[in-house]
């Protein structure tokens, strides 16, 4: 599963490079380029809670097979249209959005499956290991995507991404989900069950102050930090390497930094609190954003992206551990869905806003304001400390859960 997932993520990152770079060649302003990130992230915001409720109610294996098949089909259509030369900005955004829909349904089920495979003591290591494969793919995929696109075309990259989903589908076909001993059976999926499950998830989130801290601080970081991800292809095209290979290398440096961040996260968590790790990560990511705005030397920017990858990984993994540890098992997918909604929604909205600012005032100003916002957002830590321990569900929800209506 780990290797199949990594191969699929390599394909996804290859697609990210190809889609963003293709948009720089067919669009006339920074906004459509930034909207590629919005089209990728917005589906998670729109589908996150229903997807989490469904993931708590149905066989996750079948759900994951469906979502992987959906993404395979969307990537294949995108590849065929690109090879035929009939793809425009809105078609590219629409099919990227379709891929995001599959990812939005896939995310909560995948995240909720991780804690079922390991003990609570091993959860942080498992989250980091899952992030390692994702970020190894992030390090390899962009550079590989840039090279393949330079040697052939975006359409070939999109088709390779479609093929990458096959491995996960084959592995999922052999996987059988194991329910923890003593847990209730899932009820048959129906509209009332999904609505009830969604209401329970929202009730848990509203009633748990410790979860508020995770959501608010994740949203602030994701919103402010989205400028770097959205503007990187624009800056690369206009003032740095000017090639898809160069963009792939810079995006790969972010991924390589994330691998380093995953490797050092466990010792950091033994020595420092969650809040201190997040503060350091946010500050370093602000420095990386500032470097992208002001530095015009490719090697220096590559080093800054490496540091930015370390920063993004340590901060986001810390948020993720807190989000996965807090909810009880029977509510976990729904609570994680809200967390992923906040993360992806802030990323989507932020990308659009930073792209609009870049189009009106300039890319450099957009990045500078983003860096300042990252630093200003650290003030939230004084009022919203993070906690990596389980938070009990309200008694009325516990009674409903013991009734077995939602597994």
Where are the model-predicted features located?
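Alpha-helical transmembrane-bundle signature of multi-pass membrane transport and export proteins
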Residues: 1-407
């Amino acid at each position: 599963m780990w290797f199949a997932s990594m191969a699929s993520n390599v394909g996804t990152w290859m697609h990210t490079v190809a889609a963003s770079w293709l948009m720089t060649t067919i669009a006339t302003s920074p906004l459509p380029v930034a909207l590629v990130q919005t089209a990728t992230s917005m589906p998670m915001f729109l589908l996150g809670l229903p997807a989490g409720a469904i993931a708590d109610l149905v066989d996750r294996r079948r759900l994951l097979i469906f979502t992987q098949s959906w993404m395979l089909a969307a990537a294949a259509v995108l590849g065929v249209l690109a090879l035929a030369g009939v793809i425009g900005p809105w078609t590219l955004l629409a099919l990227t959005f379709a891929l995001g829909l599959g990812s939005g349904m896939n995310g909560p089920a995948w995240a909720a499956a991780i804690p079922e495979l390991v003990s609570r003591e091993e959860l942080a290591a498992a989250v980091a290991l899952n992030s390692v494969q994702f970020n190894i793919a992030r390090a390899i995929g962009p550079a590989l995507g840039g090279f393949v696109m330079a040697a052939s075309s975006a359409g070939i990259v999109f088709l390779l991404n479609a093929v990458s989903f096959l491995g996960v589908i084959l592995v999922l076909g052999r996987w059988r989900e194991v329910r923890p001993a003593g847990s209730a059976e899932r009820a048959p999926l129906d509209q009332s069950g999904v609505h009830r499950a969604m209401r329970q998830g929202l009730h848990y989130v509203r009633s748990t102050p410790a979860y508020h801290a995770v959501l608010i601080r994740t949203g602030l970081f994701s919103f402010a930090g989205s400028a770097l991800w959205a503007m990187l292809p624009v800056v690369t095209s206009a003032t740095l390497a000017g090639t898809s290979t160069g963009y792939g290398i810079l995006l790969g440096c972010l991924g390589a930094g994330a691998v380093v961040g995953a490797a050092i996260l466990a010792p950091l968590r033994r020595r420092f609190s969650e809040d201190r790790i997040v503060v350091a990560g946010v500050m370093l990511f602000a420095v990386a954003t500032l470097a992208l705005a002001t530095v015009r030397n490719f090697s220096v920017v590559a080093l800054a992206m490496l540091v930015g990858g370390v920063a993004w990984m340590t901060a986001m993994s810390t948020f993720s551990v807190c989000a996965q540890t807090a909810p009880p098992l029977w509510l976990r997918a729904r609570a994680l869905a809200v967390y992923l909604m906040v993360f992806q929604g802030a990323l989507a909205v932020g990308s659009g806003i930073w792209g609009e600012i870049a189009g009106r005032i300039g890319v450099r100003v957009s990045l500078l304001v983003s860096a300042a916002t990252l630093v200003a957002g650290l003030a939230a830590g004084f009022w919203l400390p993070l906690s990596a321990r389980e938070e009990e569900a309200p008694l009325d929800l516990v009674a409903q859960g013991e009734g077995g209506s939602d597994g």
